[in-house]
From Swiss-Prot:
Annotated positions binding FAD: 145-148, 166-168, 172, 183-185, 224
Enzyme class: oxidoreductase
GN (gene name): LFNR2
Protein name: Ferredoxin--NADP reductase, leaf isozyme 2, chloroplastic
EC number(s) given by UniProt: 1.18.1.2
Main localisation: plastid
Positions of the FAD-binding FR-type domain: 87-209
Lineage: Eukaryota, Viridiplantae, Streptophyta, Embryophyta, Tracheophyta
S-S pairs: 184-189
Amino acid sequence: MAAVNTVSSLPCSKAGAAVAGGAPRPSTCSVFYPPRCWSKRSSGNGVRAQASTTETTAAPAAEVTTKVEKVSKKQVDGVVTNKYRPKEPYTGRCLLNTRITGDDAPGETWHMVFSTDGEIPYREGQSIGVIPDGIDKNGKPHKLRLYSIASSAIGDFADSKTVSLCVKRLVYTNDQGEIVKGVCSNFLCDLKPGSDVKITGPVGKEMLMPKDPNATIIMLGTGTGIAPFRSFLWKMFFEEHDDYKFNGLAWLFLGVPTSSTLLYREEFERMKEIAPERFRLDFAVSREQTNAAGEKMYIQTRMAEYKDELWELLKKDNTYVYMCGLKGMEKGIDDIMIDLAAKDGIDWLDYKKQLKKSEQWNVEVY
């Protein structure tokens, strides 16, 4: 049984999780994951050692790609939903919880891993619900909150027995000048390893990955909206499966306020090293970067630099767009596409409806 020690380098505070290996880069730490055992099978997928950051392999031989018939994600066999409901949730255990934003970041974001013992058979792109401990002001149990899953279907430990989340701690001042803390986000960010957590789900089919391994997948994320894309990208570039090998193009646009909030940056940079021809990575750091006109660099501003290329990709029937994060980015992206489509005599809003119908435009915003 093969085993590999995996180190994922994540930006975090100085008080993060245990460090493995040498000294971390400034404002980062390396989260050590237990040895991965690749004799396991998950959902029919045999997974072998692909995530090691220390081994060098020869470039693979050129492969012949074949056209894959488009199959609706929502009709894929084996996708489980609502196995666990609020009245009978699954009780998992917190295995790891570490802050992944820098000390100077505007707010805290945490990466956490929960045990599932294989009882929550989720897919990349699904969500789970979390029911925080305690009762509300009416004396009733807190309602569940949904969170996008941040790990691939086999989990961060590659044993199909864990699920990971990426959660920002919600703290704000209301109109009365009172400090308000989000119930579930603070519950999760304060969890200690060994603590129990009540989980529901999995839920959702909107954000499932396309089955076509030759597809172009454009991912647009802001903040913790990166969660489902981390799950996609781990499957594409850190794992090997008997029935799936990604040969297409993955293009990630990630928008954040500061460089200390570039979540999972070192993981993504490692993926780019592994597959430079198949993975493109563009950051938009609004408080630190500007475009040529001096405008703040939001995600739509960065996309505008590639607008013609993006439009050409969107004309193809094997291009899929996934958007996750703050709702405000939708309008900015529409504004770019309206002008581009008009040059070809196309009404963008009508065209976007067609893309949605063919499951090529997938949105999960809040």
